[in-house]
A protein has these predicted regions:
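N-terminal signal-anchor/first transmembrane alpha helix
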Residues: 1-49, 107, 116-122
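C-terminal transmembrane helix and the adjacent membrane-cytosol boundary/short C-terminal tail
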Residues: 2-5, 14, 19, 104, ...
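Transmembrane-helix boundary motif in ABC transporter permease subunits
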Residues: 16-20, 92-123, 135, 139, ...
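Membrane-interfacial helix termini and adjacent extracytoplasmic/periplasmic loops
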Residues: 17-21, 134-175, 209, 242-249
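Interhelical loop and adjacent transmembrane-helix boundary motif
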Residues: 23-27, 59-62, 67-74, 236, ...
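Transmembrane alpha-helices
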Residues: 33-37, 41, 124, 176, ...
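Membrane-embedded alpha-helices of multi-pass transport/permease systems
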Residues: 37, 44-55, 95, 99-103, ...
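Periplasmic/extracellular loop-to-transmembrane helix junction in inner-membrane transport proteins
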Residues: 50-95, 264-266
């Protein structure tokens, strides 16, 4: 009896855990599961729902998209023009932020006196919020704002300068609110470049500009492209600055405003189509940026051997 029992083949484990182990799943899956559920509930489902809604226009099918590209929305006669307006705002604002952030981050990585205080000052606009910044810029740059009053008092100008209600005012606000985010990303990437590379180049007689252009800048380029991409996404979704500082009649009528107006008037298909076009436009720009990044240096930024 005991010999027969010993010769029996042990049963294969069964149950959910055994099924998961047999297919390569581990207990780490349970750690990832909340994130997957969150993504499905708050990202994938809204995107799929919005995409489906965008095909339910007045004539069904792609009529909402056709109306967008022919400027035929019932409550917005310049929807397609708003796409170019948004790009003309977001791209220059992002480029200016990157051009300002790169040299500052490069200088800060070497260490400066009061680095924490200076970094905190640069980060202040991010903590204020875009609505507060837009309202502040109205008081600062408006026809009766402090800047114009100072210029008039000093007799530098005879009439107030038009710095709000136009393209320039929105662009300035976008740069002001986007710069801290851009700087923070660039500072993190610049800090990852080994300072010994600069020291070695300096010992070989390279000056500061030579070291920057020939050593640091090529190493920074992958980080610059990522920073540009993320900053562009932030600028492309501009709404408070364009609404409070711009002119909805045309010069600064951005896509987010078009979507808001259509949604407010119950044209949900048009609003969803506008949102989908916004997403595609961003993906195209990001695709170009990442294509450029794929051709850049992707090796180590440390000065170690090997």
């Amino acid at each position: 009896m005991s010999a027969a029992t010993a010769s029996r083949t042990p049963r294969a484990p069964h149950g959910v855990r055994a099924w998961m182990r047999a297919r390569g799943f581990t207990s780490a899956v349970w750690l990832v599961l909340p994130g997957v559920v969150f993504m499905i509930a708050f990202f994938i489902y809204p995107v799929v729902y919005g995409l489906n809604l965008s095909f339910q226009g007045r004539n069904g099918g792609v009529s909402a998209y056709a109306d967008f590209f022919t400027n035929s929305f019932p409550h917005d006669s310049g929807s397609f023009d708003s796409l170019w307006t948004t790009l003309k705002l977001a791209l220059p604002a992002t480029l200016i932020c990157v051009l300002i952030a790169v040299p500052i981050a490069w200088r800060f990585r070497a260490g400066v006196r009061g680095l924490r205080v200076l970094t905190a000052v640069i980060m202040i606009p991010m903590t204020l919020g875009s609505v507060f910044v837009a309202e502040s810029f109205n008081n600062l740059l408006g026809p009766a704002g402090w800047v114009n009053r100072l210029l008039l008092t000093l007799h530098i100008v005879r009439t107030p300068l038009e710095m709000t209600g136009n393209f320039a005012g929105v662009l300035i606000a976008l740069v002001f609110t986007g710069l801290p985010f851009t700087f923070l990303l660039m500072l993190g990437y610049a800090a990852g470049i080994d300072a010994s590379l600069d020291r070695a180049a300096s010992m070989l007689g390279a000056g500061p500009l030579q070291r920057f252009w020939r050593i640091d800048f090529p190493l920074l380029l992958p980080g610059i492209t990522i920073t540009f991409a993320l900053s562009f996404v932030l600028s492309f979704a501009v709404f408070p600055s364009a609404t409070l500082l711009g002119n909805d009649a045309g010069p600064t009528r951005v896509l987010s405003k078009v979507a808001y107006v259509e949604y407010s008037n119950g044209n949900y298909a048009n609003a969803s189509a506008t949102a989908m076009i916004m997403a595609v436009a961003q993906l195209i720009v990001l695709g170009v940026v990442f294509l450029i990044r794929s051709r850049l240096y992707r090796g180590s930024t440390s000065g170690g051997k090997g």
